[in-house]
UniProtKB/Swiss-Prot annotation:
It comes from Candida glabrata (strain ATCC 2001 / BCRC 20586 / JCM 3761 / NBRC 0622 / NRRL Y-65 / CBS 138). GO terms for cellular component: ERMES complex; mitochondrial outer membrane. Belongs to the mitochondrial Rho GTPase family. Ca(2+) 2 binds at residues 333, 335, 337, 344. GO terms for molecular function: calcium ion binding; GTP binding; GTPase activity. This is Mitochondrial Rho GTPase 1.
Amino acid sequence: MTKETIRVVICGDDGVGKTSLIVSLVKGQFIPNLQAVLPPVTIPRDFSSSPYSPKNTVLIDTDNSDPLAIQRELKNADVIWLVYSDKDSYERISLYWMITFRSLGLNIPVILCKNKCDQYTTNSPLEDFLDTKIEDEEFIPILMAFKEVDTCVKASAKTHFDVNQSFYLCQRSISYPISPLFDAKVGDLKPSAVAALSRIFFLSDEDQDGFLNDNEIMDLQRKCFGKSIDLNELNFIKHTLSDLTSSEEYPSEILYCQGKGLTKQGFIALNKIYTEKGRHETTWGILRAFNYTDSLSIDDAVLFPKVNVPEQASVELSSKGYRFLVDIFIKFDSDNDGALNDTELHTLFRSTPGLPNLWLETNFPASTVVNAKGFVTLQGWLAQWTMTTYLDYKITTAYLVYLGFQEDAKLAVQITKSRRMRRRQGRLYRSYVTDRKVFNCFVVGKRNSGKSSLLESFLGRLFSEAYSPTIRPRVAVNNVEVTGDKQYYLILQEFGEQEEAILQNPSRLAECDVLCLTYDSSDPESFSYLLELLTNNEIMKDIPVVFVALKADLDKQQQRCKFQPDEFTDTLYLDHPLHVSSTWSSSLNQLFKKIIQASLEPGKFTPGFPPDIKPTNIDYSSAVILGSSIGFLALFSYTMIKLLKPTQQ
């Protein structure tokens, strides 16, 4: 993006008027008999309304008698203002100056300025002064030979003609560089510029009909430039594109369609015209409004805004984030069936780098709620983004920007309070939770205990008898309604072959709100796996636990281990295992609600606390009200006694 300060080095042969140009710019008038070389002159941003103008511009005058000093200044320059005034100084542009710049390895723009234009007359002097077109016979050879020459301009320090314009062109070459946009050799916009403009067209096409109608053009104009487009200019754009349609340059492309609007190719052609005519600041105005940097990538500061997330806190979507995601879903659900099919999903993500890697890793859409055809529903769409935000909020902020979120992306997320800890019997345990709506549950158990079926049932899918062992981690996310119509989101994770390694990793366990310890109640060897895990991993006992006896629709078997499940949970002062079957929907609902309860009240589900010291939720507000009431009554009674006492005497 624009630098705070840019350095403009003015070069050229002796006598071309370098110093006079600087003085004419600063003083607004011609002053004769100047000193040979001026010290650096700093010009602040006080005349430009553009937010992309540099804060300060430093003009460096040069003395040709000290070539080493010139070289030092050139190596620190951001742009070169190269001045000539006659035939001899013009010839030295290509024979000396441009060769010198290249020998120094400079890769900065050069603004070529023909000074002292007041000395040249033609049959029409006014015409000569106003002729600043690039087709000038002196400029074209230079532009063709040296790609580093950004633009050319005629000026006169004596009459102050186009001195300000020359200075602006120096600033513009940095604030609105043409090199990222236009390939002079090919004579066309660069692919990266076409890609950026195509994305902007896509985001601006609100009704997704492939055209920018008048209202959409007006909205784009207001977003980019803060004002409505003039109707005459809009009609001129339409006529220009209509004339170009079927021209030699665009033989088979429709650029503008009467009654519909600009096509994507027409929008790109319009911006090509802007760059060819030296109006590329207009194109940059459009690009900058969509947060593109000079490298034509979206600014990282916009994609990944600084969000302060305290340790043991989590990140969730805010109401603005949810609202935007609902609107996006509705916008691209073109058949209004309440789900996004493959085509609609592909179209939705056209303005992004594609599906997030996290979604691919979690096997989206198998990770969330889909309809009978396997298409993600609105419920599943919101659940997937909820999980994404919880696991890696930076993915969410970046993709919301890609999808067209207009505000600061950090407004789409909110930070929960840090997890609080309390102490009982010398042990720390997690305090109750009041402000979180998203919880993370690790589903643990022996192979073939029914974990995968549990995840499938959580997403509302039909039970399958077929067994397929889980190798890679799996995840499922859905919303859960608890008593009082309160809605929470629950993430269930199954780890497959990585299970033991993850359970031995303190940092991974810290991410877990509840351990769902499952066993197959019809397999006598299943519960012993959990006993062994808890024996070998003491750290697991610091996390809230819910025991679950799966496959409860099958015959219950005595477990071949030291403790039976009910006995073991009694030793931990925990509830007996819930008996759950993937074919019993009521038991599933009971389990998911219990996991949410354990997340909200972790102290009650942490192993090892006897019932008499189980942490309870204290209604502090009631206590405060009660205490205040007692205090008020005491004060009132005391006051009345004091008032009545003299009367009694």
